[in-house]
Amino acid sequence: GRPSARYDAPYCSEEELQACDCSHNPVRDACQCAYDPAGSPACDCYCVEPWRR
């Protein structure tokens, strides 16, 4: 894979984590939230398989 960013991105807030709801997704029902390494100020949450968290 590509090298990880070498700077500390801010963590997603608890509210953003709570707002991510993947329960409607039968397979990818686990939330993974992270800041975009490209420098986006928005917290990006997406649904992943539980074992990929």
UniProtKB/Swiss-Prot annotation:
GO terms for molecular function: ion channel regulator activity; toxin activity. Its main location: secreted. Residues 1-5 form a propeptide. It is found in: Secreted. GO terms for cellular component: extracellular region. Contains 4 disulfide bonds. Keywords: Disulfide bond, Ion channel impairing toxin, Neurotoxin, Secreted, Toxin. Expressed by the venom duct. Probable neurotoxin with unknown target. Possibly targets ion channels. The cysteine framework is XXII (C-C-C-C-C-C-C-C). This is Conotoxin Cal22e. It comes from Californiconus californicus (California cone).
